[in-house]
Amino acid sequence: MSDFQKSFSESTSSIKFDEKYIDTSVQPNDIGVAEQWAVKTVADPCVGNLATPVNSGYFTKAFINNLPFYREGISPNFRGLETGAAFGYLLYGPFTMTGPLRNSEFALTAGLLATIGAVHILTALFVLYNAPGKAPNVQPPDATVNNPPKDLFTRAGWADFTSGFWLGGCGGAVFAWLLVGTLHLDSIMPIIKNIWTAG
């Protein structure tokens, strides 16, 4: 407990409430089944990290801990490669179908170039995050992620993650571009393009 927290708890310990404002008909044990849904602090309540039914539930913990950023047993470079591939693959569709060249014959290539440009911008932001004086912030364990990866939150780990993200993002965009350019999708491409066409 920090000095501020000690002084705060000491200053509030002498607070007495007027008896007419205290409801004695409800006791903590009266809550019953709803007690399992109560919000509890994970560690320090002043940090604001609370264990709620959403962030500490089984499905949420299983989903978040299986994402490449938090999965155990993989290197920072592979974390970046997998995350970047997902970003590149998923960003290609919106850039292709809603971009300014969506009704031209260059829509697929323009979407590819726009996606690679967005991956470059995100990579530059990751590099800038690692550039200032101190190393990246190490995430403490919380209600959702019990064991965050220690090797990722170092300068070398973050640099490996960034290079993997760039390679995976460009590769994911190229894979989506090749997939959309195949012949079996030619019959549905006009339908998809007409969904977002304004006039």
Curated annotation (Swiss-Prot):
Family: Belongs to the PsaL family.
GO cellular component entries: photosystem I reaction center; plasma membrane-derived thylakoid membrane
Segment forming the signal sequence: none
Keywords: Membrane, Photosynthesis, Photosystem I, Thylakoid, Transmembrane, Transmembrane helix
Coiled-coil regions, chain positions: none
The protein's name: Photosystem I reaction center subunit XI
Transmembrane segments: 108-128, 165-185
Membrane topology: Multi-pass membrane protein
Stored PANTHER family: PHOTOSYSTEM I REACTION CENTER SUBUNIT XI, CHLOROPLASTIC (PTHR34803:SF2)
GO biological process terms held by the UniProt record: photosynthesis
Compartments reported by the entry: Cellular thylakoid membrane
Top-level taxon: Bacteria
